[in-house]
Amino acid sequence: MIKSELVQRIAEHNPHLYQRDVENIVNAILDEIVAALARGDRVELRGFGAFSVKHRPARAGRNPRTGAHVPVDQKSVPFFKTGKEMRERLNRDTGAPDSGA
């Protein structure tokens, strides 16, 4: 599902809202999550999961084509950890065994 499909589905389930208003709300939520992560904050949505930033140290990499060693700079990457309720629902709905993670 892409963002436009998400907006459309939310608008269909909430006929009292205009689709452009739903799109503005979804964009505002996503913008706030990104802004919080950029500040170094953790964003927790109970039952859904938590967004955070993980910092990867600089390391030596390898060019797969030439085999030459190349330095890889340190970087920050977004990380998402699913909430307990989401994990339970996904495992219940798919019939997959609970990994306990």
Swiss-Prot record:
InterPro entries: Hist_DNA-bd, Histone-like_DNA-bd_CS, IHF-like_DNA-bd_dom_sf, IHF_beta. Coiled coil: none annotated. It holds the Pfam family Bac_DNA_binding. GO terms for cellular component: chromosome; cytosol. Keywords: DNA recombination, DNA-binding, Transcription, Transcription regulation, Translation regulation. Residues 58-101 are annotated as: Disordered. HAMAP family: IHF_beta. This is Integration host factor subunit beta. The lineage of its organism: Bacteria, Pseudomonadati, Pseudomonadota, Alphaproteobacteria, Hyphomicrobiales.
